[in-house]
Amino acid sequence: MTAKPAAAAARATVYGYPRQGPHRELKKAIEGYWKGRVDADALRETAAELRRGTWQQLAEAGVHEVPTGDFSYYDHVLDTSVMVGAVPERHRASVEADALDGYFAMARGTQDVAPLEMTKWFDTNYHYLVPELGPDTVFSADSAKQVAEFREALALGWTPRPVLVGPLTYLLLAKAAPGVAADFEPLTLLDRLLPVYAEILADLRAAGATWVQLDEPALVQDRTPAELNAAARAYRELGGRADRPQLLVASYFGRLGEALAVLAKAPVDGLALDFTESGAGNLDDLAAAGGLPGKRLVAGVVNGRNIWINDYAKSLATLGTLLGLADRVDVSASCSLLHVPLDADAERGIDPETARWLAFAKQKTEEIVVLARGLGSGTDAIASELAANRADLASRTGAALTRDPAVRARTAAVTEADGRRSQPYAERSAAQRAGLGLPLLPTTTIGSFPQTTELRTARAELRAGRIDEAEYEERVKDEIREVLSFQEKAGIDVLVHGEPERNDMVQYFAEQLDGYLATQHGWVQSYGTRYVRPPVLAGDISRPEPMTVRWTTYAQSLTARPVKGMLTGPVTMLAWSFVRDDQPLGDTARQVALALRDEVNDLEANGTSVIQVDEPALRETLPLRAAEHAAYLEWATESFRIATSGVRPDTQIHTHMCYAEFGDIVQAIDDLDADVISLEAARSHMQVARELAAHGYPREAGPGVYDIHSPRIPGAEEAAALLRKGLEAIPAERLWVNPDCGLKTRGWPETRASLENLVAAARQIRAELPTGAA
């Protein structure tokens, strides 16, 4: 049957686009600027060229409105803090002296000034800089960046739509500034902030903007009546002004829920909603609310967070249902395309049959345009695209890669006992203390050490065939010896081999597991200039052979001190990959857990007495709505226990988490039943230690005392001060001393100095303890 065309031709648009450039030009330019090799003018020109390229690509693909203002040197939330004048007092002088250097100082810190805290952007793998606010915060409008980028696109002949982080989301993501009472609520500043937003909107209208997008993803989370009332008040005030452009309020990452009725009644001109699986319920809620009469609806039907092709027939059915629920219906992705790589056509190493299933930002844009044409002109207008899409979907469904009978049989045979250690923690702990013989406040690191130029050169030479595998392995062994030697001299108690053989903590394992695919150019932004290439989990997962045993046992042969085995946990293997969407995540996690269980058991059998299974993604993958937490945490914690419960009681299991607020998952952390957990804590001033104590967490913990996301070197007294805070919450016999995270992105000089200071701090605090331990 042929779909009828929409009353008004649907248009294609996107909320945002990857920033880095086809060859990560932005990363290279910014890092060149930091090193003094690129001047500010050259950096700005590179940025302008990348913006122009993005807008041209979008417009040529058929996108009606191109987003502006979503481009950022580091982070769009940090850009918003600058836009509204919320610069922390400690950074104000540097920003006033040089706006660009001051901006980067807020993100990275300096030797003497700490940066803003960094955490995950909702449940994604992107990180934002947390605004610091207090009762004395004075906002002021600075629309220069937004207006300039709008004018850039306008001058090139495109139709720009500026994108701003909305005022509700900005305040709900903020936290109390240092020195402000921890219970301060940034949302109390809304009436102060709204006039600043109104001024910025007026500036954009004066520059020629007809539509402005205000992103409010915070409204898809559980919100209190007071927060919903604040949303109503905010958009009543902003929407009621005569000097504003038309306002498109965008929600994404889930169901808008109670906030939908609030925004539907507000005097705004359009809403953008997520109609993919993550936004299940938005369609029914919209119909129940009576639709959006007189308003524009932007329907996010293409998944902006995963890399699988769209099901055109399914999306067109959703879009057809939406017709009549709004004055006009346009088509987009479910969120900004920031979260996917740029172009699947650049991938030459993936089997052509499998490549048919992939859609990166460029392909998703093309999908959006096709769907808009089908909605606006009828399905006959896209008949060839529909036929090709059906064939591609069928190819994936029938592929051998996606079904391994042996994996499915083993997964089905898992019992509750497979996820339970043979002894309770109290008994295990005694055996581990006796076996390891560690001092109070034992020191360790999280796993990785700096990835040197020599290491990267060796990998490149191996790939190019200029050295053979044997030569490469000798270079890796040289690096392991150097890392171990340094740790022993520094006085670290539990060592790591430094992971010189690993390119990435997920990709390294994915390349050795059946069922995963690797990309060559699938880069996405994690934070700032840190880009990662998430592997593609396309099929059933199994481990053909041991992955880490030879490197860990080699390292252990060089020292009498314990060397940790280092693995990435099942939840993180999923969260930091692009995961198949054709079966429940819990089923996929169990497959990964069983593969890791084999690796854990092999490490133990080869003499490894401390094994760390990192789960930094446990919190970030937590669903945004509380009603969905229990089901997620059940399979997430079970998968960790399946991976780690096959070892003897005297084998110490560690885990690690970072970048997140942990207060609402402390019970889940407890349920992991790990013997030791290390967590990011330096920037949050040991908040997580207090959260663990409030819960009554009974095991050992290492809240980080060294912020590795900044190049600054914390002094021994600074680390000691954090340890004293930690001891207020965690008893000395259960407190570990460690950095926040791995050291891969740091340089050797700062790493050496920082770890030496960390060990000095541990020794100082041991001496201060009543036992006088040294």
Curated annotation (Swiss-Prot):
Residues holding L-methionine: I446, G447, S448, E499, D614
Names of required cofactors: Zn(2+)
UniProt keyword annotations, A-Z: Amino-acid biosynthesis, Metal-binding, Methionine biosynthesis, Methyltransferase, Repeat, Transferase, Zinc
Family annotation (Pfam families): Meth_synt_1, Meth_synt_2
Residues involved in 5-methyltetrahydropteroyltri-L-glutamate binding: R24, E25, L26, K27, K120, W576, E620
Catalytic activity, as annotated: 5-methyltetrahydropteroyltri-L-glutamate + L-homocysteine = tetrahydropteroyltri-L-glutamate + L-methionine
InterPro entries assigned: Cbl-indep_Met_Synth_N, Cobalamin-indep_Met_synthase, Met_Synth_C/arc, UROD/MetE-like_sf
TM annotation in the entry: none
Statement: the UniProt record of this protein carries the keyword Secreted: no
Cystine pairings recorded for this chain: none
Sites where the protein binds L-homocysteine: I446, G447, S448, E499, D614
Highest rank taxon of the organism: Bacteria
An MF annotation (GO) of this entry: zinc ion binding
Enzyme class: transferase
Active-site residues, as the UniProt record annotates them: H709 (proton donor)
Pathway per the UniProt entry: Amino-acid biosynthesis; L-methionine biosynthesis via de novo pathway; L-methionine from L-homocysteine (MetE route): step 1/1
Gene Ontology biological-process annotations: methionine biosynthetic process; methylation
Coiled-coil annotated residue ranges, if any: none
Family: Belongs to the vitamin-B12 independent methionine synthase family.
Protein's name according to its UniProt entry: 5-methyltetrahydropteroyltriglutamate--homocysteine methyltransferase
Annotated source species: Streptomyces griseus subsp. griseus (strain JCM 4626 / CBS 651.72 / NBRC 13350 / KCC S-0626 / ISP 5235)
